[in-house]
């Protein structure tokens, strides 16, 4: 299983998810979508099956 750190910040009406190891980011409309959006981004970027992607919440800024 691949594990990645994420940093999440509030940006207006969106949540911005930063994935430092990949130098990328994605956005979620609702907090409940953050984990899925991060895992999807990582899976696509690394060509790893989504069920093999784990995330570690490093920082969450409201």
Residue positions per predicted region:
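Short, charged, surface-exposed hinge/linker loops at domain edges
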Residues: 1-7, 36-62
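A short, exposed loop/beta-hairpin motif centered on an aromatic-Gly-Thr core
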Residues: 19-32
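Short aromatic-glycine-(Arg/Gly/Cys) micro-motifs in beta-strand/loop hairpins
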Residues: 2-21
């Amino acid at each position: 299983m691949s594990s990645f750190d994420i940093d999440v910040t509030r940006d207006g009406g969106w949540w911005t998810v930063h994935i430092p190891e990949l130098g990328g980011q994605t956005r979620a409309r609702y907090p409940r979508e953050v984990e899925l959006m991060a895992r999807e981004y990582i899976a696509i970027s690394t060509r790893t099956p989504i069920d093999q992607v784990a995330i570690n919440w490093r920082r969450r800024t409201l």
